[in-house]
């Protein structure tokens, strides 16, 4: 089967009150359009055509790697006119599935069923299949009109509906599937004689009836699948639905969430057994949590892998890190891109790392900056230690070998190497390589000035 998918993404989105095109607004960390394209990809189509118009160049430049064929709708003359723009690129014998970029939560299983409906009833594949839904509040949506036999013969848009039609609960989702040849016959016949002065795609239903093309419908199992986004309130509502579904899926697979309503996933999260996630945690990109991991409250993890038995304490921020088994991080720690921890490492409160590679058992427990540094096994980094890695132009590396003990308030001026089992005295500024197994310090004599008095403030006249 040749399957061609058309995604309508040309709308202006006036009710968003934004300079950003509506389809670029994010839900669960991704643009709305990306959600729909990723769902479409799971159907293995021959092509995905995205119809763009308002803010089109911004859309294309923001999503340059989408595997789609971009089709420009120069004038936004309605949904029917938008679909018509793609038809020259689609062979007559292909099936065409029409989706909307602002309906992001539609499920691939639903679309597969709709495609099957479009093939089921007639051997010449001329059926028009519509995705419909029953909504308690159908306001703003096109209503399905059926005859006495229950057959669909029309769809009436909200702005063209009388009070009787507005009372109908069954709505058209904007999603349909039929043979391309049907659309090529019907679309040029559309009229813009309606309240909006637009060429509605929904008018193809009346044309299908006139041509005696069978119309079938599939009712969406979940109302959220057909919910569109026209304003920021609706965006927030679907965000919470998406997050709740993601939370439920994680809990079904064995993770514990302290509060599913205070959990945010903005990418992919893979959890081992007996993972615990406290409140207000944000997971972005691809995050992997090994067996028995615990994530404290108010943490942010972006593109992070944690091994088994790791614990991240409250208010810690991790980005682009790979953490091995049984490590402890935080509270209030910041691990930046390029940080790698071997097993049994500890990063304590108010420690920042960047491009820092820790071997087994190494600890930095308090108040340190460790950037562009290689640390061996069982190193102890004292409070207030800083690797001074930037000379104003270039970054330089610090190497700290196995078993080193670094006293508090030490500055390591890179490039510099500290030999194995060396000890650095507290308050030292290390500018040259340190030999192994020795104590190195930069001594400044302590001096007492006897009889010195503090200045006394004088009262002003």
Swiss-Prot record:
Homotrimer. It is found in: Cytoplasm. Its cofactor is Mg(2+). Residues 254-461 are annotated as: N-acetyltransferase. Its main location: cytoplasm. Residues 1-232 are annotated as: Pyrophosphorylase. It comes from Legionella pneumophila subsp. pneumophila (strain Philadelphia 1 / ATCC 33152 / DSM 7513). Pfam families: Hexapep, NTP_transf_3. Pathway: Nucleotide-sugar biosynthesis; UDP-N-acetyl-alpha-D-glucosamine biosynthesis; N-acetyl-alpha-D-glucosamine 1-phosphate from alpha-D-glucosamine 6-phosphate (route II): step 2/2; Nucleotide-sugar biosynthesis; UDP-N-acetyl-alpha-D-glucosamine biosynthesis; UDP-N-acetyl-alpha-D-glucosamine from N-acetyl-alpha-D-glucosamine 1-phosphate: step 1/1; Bacterial outer membrane biogenesis; LPS lipid A biosynthesis. Its EC number is 2.7.7.23, 2.3.1.157. The active site is at 366 (proton acceptor). This is Bifunctional protein GlmU. UDP-N-acetyl-alpha-D-glucosamine binds at residues 8-11, 22, 73, 78-79, 142, 157, 230, 336, 354, 369, 380. It catalyses: alpha-D-glucosamine 1-phosphate + acetyl-CoA = N-acetyl-alpha-D-glucosamine 1-phosphate + CoA + H(+); N-acetyl-alpha-D-glucosamine 1-phosphate + UTP + H(+) = UDP-N-acetyl-alpha-D-glucosamine + diphosphate. GO terms for biological process: cell morphogenesis; cell wall organization; lipid A biosynthetic process; peptidoglycan biosynthetic process; regulation of cell shape; UDP-N-acetylglucosamine biosynthetic process.
